[in-house]
Amino acid sequence: MIAYIKGLLAADGPGWVVIDVNGIGYHVSIPSTTQLPALGHEVKLFTHMSVREDGIQFFGFAKEDEKECFLLLLNVAGVGPKVALAVVSHLPPSNLRSAIAIEDVNQLVKVPGVGKKTAQRILLELKDKLKGMAAVEHSTLQQSVITTGSGDEAVEALLALGYSQGEARDAVKKAQKSAPEEDLSALIKIALKELAPSR
């Protein structure tokens, strides 16, 4: 299995690149949000190779966690590479984890090609499979409720979901203003909803 491809960026377009590795050009499908260097500069993409009857296709990601999300999405019934790539393109890993943690169907149905049934299936199946991501982080949210009731714990829970210190603090502050009487679990959910449209 090819874990990554590293070479010179020979060509690019909407959702694809060609990487020149020692004179061989690899055509790789990528998320539309991938930040690329200028043509002729070195690029490294973590890859997944899809082998089908009609040929071989490479999917590449600038970050390993994007690739992990893509592979996990492929395990969901009815989700193929095209839909999985669309999800990763529209929802960064932190947003996908947040959507799973709060079972936010609306975030997923905004992705082109993802209907309500597919979104519900993704949430249902990945809630159990994302042990290193959604499940552990959702557990962190629950532990935060048990350990303390402070805003700092809410911030820490959001940091565990991949948000920056500034994003987490701002979201918690807004959540506390809009719902000062809520318990920590509800506070975190409100903060996640504040963060969801920001990415």
From Swiss-Prot:
Keyword Amino-acid biosynthesis carried by entry: no
Annotated keywords: Cytoplasm, DNA damage, DNA recombination, DNA repair, DNA-binding
Region feature (Domain I): 1-62
Main location: cytoplasm
Residue segments, region Domain III: 152-199
Annotated region (Flexible linker), positions in chain: 142-152
Region (Domain II): 63-141
Gene Ontology CC: one annotated term: cytoplasm
UniProt GO molecular function: ATP binding; four-way junction DNA binding; four-way junction helicase activity
Subcellular location(s) per record: Cytoplasm
Biological processes per GO annotation: DNA recombination; DNA repair
Entry remark concerning the domains of this protein: Has three domains with a flexible linker between the domains II and III and assumes an 'L' shape. Domain III is highly mobile and contacts RuvB.
NCBIfam families: ruvA
Annotated function: The RuvA-RuvB-RuvC complex processes Holliday junction (HJ) DNA during genetic recombination and DNA repair, while the RuvA-RuvB complex plays an important role in the rescue of blocked DNA replication forks via replication fork reversal (RFR). RuvA specifically binds to HJ cruciform DNA, conferring on it an open structure. The RuvB hexamer acts as an ATP-dependent pump, pulling dsDNA into and through the RuvAB complex. HJ branch migration allows RuvC to scan DNA until it finds its consensus sequence, where it cleaves and resolves the cruciform DNA.
UniProt family annotation: Belongs to the RuvA family.
Quaternary context: Homotetramer. Forms an RuvA(8)-RuvB(12)-Holliday junction (HJ) complex. HJ DNA is sandwiched between 2 RuvA tetramers; dsDNA enters through RuvA and exits via RuvB. An RuvB hexamer assembles on each DNA strand where it exits the tetramer. Each RuvB hexamer is contacted by two RuvA subunits (via domain III) on 2 adjacent RuvB subunits; this complex drives branch migration. In the full resolvosome a probable DNA-RuvA(4)-RuvB(12)-RuvC(2) complex forms which resolves the HJ.
The protein, known as: Holliday junction branch migration complex subunit RuvA
GN (gene name): ruvA
